[in-house]
């Protein structure tokens, strides 16, 4: 069976219109899928019975199912999805979260995954501990939004591509999903409510700059010099800071939007005053905001978050250099909301069950 959800409007078969005018039924079907967030084809009540039967027999409507749901004391919800392939990915729903640019907000933000695992091997991250397995399809990316809304009984209105995987390494499916998410016939979420976070794939940043959508960009920097960044982010060997920051400058110039430099603070690794001073120079060059993220510990990794004094000192250096700076107090700390942790627990559970079955 073919997946129904990743179809673009102009890809839906013309015979669905049943002679009732261009795009008539296709728009109805798209509205049921993306606007009304139908849970099944059977809910599409204004379609003819023969058309519903055809859709049910020829198309697969469910790209993923909920495997685990964890709630945090701060109302963050972490969702673990099982894909039809048997793989797992995570999404995180963050109610009433402040936006990345410092404003207060009552939005419901959803953090999306784009890959099963990750190939980029950032030393502090749980997503890459099991390596990269495959890219998500556009349908699997969009389904995270629709199924989260159904599970939480709320409408998501802000998206951040900061979950498992490197979004720009799955560029074609990312752009296809964005087309569906942003389109009036699709999920209808405006581009200015969408942020893509990247570990620093310079060519794809330049390609994204040429796209018409006014999407926000967040760079996972985490080190202000090649020496420090290279220790914890292997991608820096392929795209060192000079090349990466030049690509970001091109993006900022073409889009005219403030971008964010994300910086996870790790005790004794990247939290020195010298790193803060160099980071401030990068931020001023790009006219960027800095989002400091005290490290969210990951089981099996030895990194630690700095103490409050070191965090405040680092932020003070940036603010003293007139760089807009926020310190993000991680949400979902009590539910392992750092990328990939819930998936790793599920994989260990499955492995234990398999050993017992054997």
Feature-to-residue mapping (PLM):
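A short, flexible beta-alpha/helix-coil linker loop
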Residues: 36, 98-99, 128-132, 225-226, ...
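Conserved AdoMet/S-adenosylmethionine-binding subsite of the radical SAM
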Residues: 147-158, 163-326
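Residue-level structural signal for beta-strand termini and adjacent loop
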Residues: 93-94, 173
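Auxiliary Fe-S-binding modules of radical SAM enzymes
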Residues: 1-89, 95, 249-258, 263-358
């Amino acid at each position: 069976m073919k997946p129904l959800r990743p179809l673009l409007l102009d890809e839906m078969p013309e015979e669905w219109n049943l002679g009732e005018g261009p795009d008539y039924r296709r728009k109805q079907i798209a509205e049921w899928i993306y606007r009304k967030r139908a849970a099944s084809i059977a809910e599409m009540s204004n379609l003819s019975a023969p058309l519903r039967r055809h859709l049910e027999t020829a198309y697969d409507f469910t790209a993923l199912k909920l495997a685990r749901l964890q709630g945090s004391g701060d109302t963050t919800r972490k969702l673990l999805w099982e894909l039809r392939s048997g793989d797992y990915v995570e999404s995180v729903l963050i109610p009433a979260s402040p936006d990345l640019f410092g404003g207060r907000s009552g939005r419901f933000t959803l953090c999306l995954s784009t890959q099963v695992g990750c190939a980029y091997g950032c030393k502090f991250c749980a997503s890459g501990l099991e390596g990269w397995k495959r890219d998500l399809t556009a349908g699997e990316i969009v389904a995270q939004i629709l199924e989260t809304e159904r599970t939480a009984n709320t409408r998501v209105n802000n998206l951040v591509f900061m979950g498992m995987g490197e979004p720009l390494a799955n560029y074609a499916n990312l752009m296809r999903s964005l087309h569906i998410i942003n389109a009036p016939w699709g999920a209808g979420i405006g581009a200015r409510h969408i942020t893509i976070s990247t570990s620093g794939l310079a060519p794809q940043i330049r390609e994204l700059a040429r796209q018409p959508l006014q999407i926000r960009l967040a760079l996972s920097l985490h080190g202000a010099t090649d020496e420090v960044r290279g220790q914890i982010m292997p991608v820096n060997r392929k795209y060192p800071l000079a090349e990466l920051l030049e690509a970001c400058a091109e993006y900022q110039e073409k889009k005219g939007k403030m971008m964010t430099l994300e910086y996870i603070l790790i005790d004794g690794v990247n939290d020195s005053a010298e790193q803060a001073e160099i980071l401030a120079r990068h931020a001023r060059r790009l006219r960027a905001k800095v989002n400091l993220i005290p490290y969210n510990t990951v089981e099996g990794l030895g990194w630690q978050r700095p103490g409050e004094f070191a965090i405040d000192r680092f932020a003070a250096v940036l603010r003293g250099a007139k760089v807009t700076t926020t310190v993000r107090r991680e949400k979902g700390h009590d539910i392992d909301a750092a990328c990939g942790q819930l998936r790793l627990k599920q994989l260990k559970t499955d492995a234990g069950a398999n050993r017992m079955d054997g």
